[in-house]
Swiss-Prot record:
Biological-process GO terms, alphabetical: polyprenol biosynthetic process
Function statement: Catalyzes the condensation of isopentenyl diphosphate (IPP) with allylic pyrophosphates generating different type of terpenoids.
Protein name: Isoprenyl transferase
Keywords carried by this UniProt record: Magnesium, Metal-binding, Transferase
Gene name in the database record: uppS
Amino acid sequence: MSESKKPLNHLAIIMDGNGRWAKKRHLPRFVGHRHGMDNIRNIALAANKLGIKVLTLYAFSTENWARPTDEVNYLMRLPIDFFDKFMPELMENNVRVNIMGFVDELPEKTYLVTQKAMAETANNTGMVLNFAFNYGSRREITAGVQEIARKVKVGEIDIDDISEKMVSDHLLTHSLAPYEDPDLLIRTSGEERLSNFLLWQMAYTEFSFSDKLWPDFDKTDLEELVKDYQGRNRRFGKV
């Protein structure tokens, strides 16, 4: 198999455009978030059928706390509704749930439902549905570096032992090994920026940007972008 035809092991998606989707329809923003939540189910099942091993979804950033309180409170309820509604299908499709972020800062009910989802799917061996929730890449890297520094301070490791792999092993994605780094990033809604998402892990990631708003992004859109990715020549800095 040629380099360009290798499977897409880790797909990351910045799910953007829920608010604009609602605004275009003269609806409250929370309606867009609700439709966006339902679309997670559609895209997750489609990605699973494509053989993707890890699907990482940027669900809530550490910066999103600055949104209006009513909106934040609604977003904190969505994981409860999502797993209540779709857990049977996740189990049926052998999907394992992982929550990646500073989850100890979540409201108790939200935290408990995420931990329950991980526990209930822990023995599933199919695709990992990895939610980045209360996640920020700069904070993740800072926390990882601080932990390495503590180990150096107490003599657990030598400063010369610090390597790229060691840094990776101290990031929140280490549990996704050997697929910590996304092969492809998709961002919906036409925006073309990373928004503090997986900055270390995406050093060699391919990017695709869709003009579709997240609630409208469907299976066909996903398949087209995956096909485009599979036709690319990933050189990783080589000729």
